[in-house]
Amino acid sequence: MVAVIKTGHSIHRIFNYNENKVAEGVASIIGAENYPLDTENLSLKMKLCLQERHLALNTNVSRNSVHISLNFAPSEEGLGKDTLKEIATKYMREIGFGEQPFLVYQHFDSGHPHLHIVTNNIRNDGSRIDLHHLGIRKSEPARKSIEKEYNFVRAEDQKRQRYIALPV
């Protein structure tokens, strides 16, 4: 499993990227954690509004949006929606984002299974979650723990491959 963390200035851009993929039929939303309603009962506006409310708690933070992709080896195709959601939730908890509102999208637009997670780094009390060295200090141990628990191909054992987008 390979985890990629990108931070940004615009939750709208990250959110719209994923929702546009859903509209194109190459992704689906499989989870909305720490939201007041179940995923299927959330409108587009409701999904984005909770993220925006968090950001309003601390307007001094410029890099406040977090876009994470969890990428699995092609041989791990066929993971069920519930398993993928469980993996995303464990990963977020282990990197210190378990209490944050986050959206989980399953994408089908490449030659390997992968998830996208949309969240922010502003806590309910307005303090920010430090993103400095998040990859090394939190993401790497979380990734390795999940690889071991689910018996996934270790990122270190995978050869770098070019993934070719599949026609839809």
Language-model region placement:
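N-terminal nicking endonuclease/strand-transfer module with a His-rich metal-binding environment
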Residues: 1-168
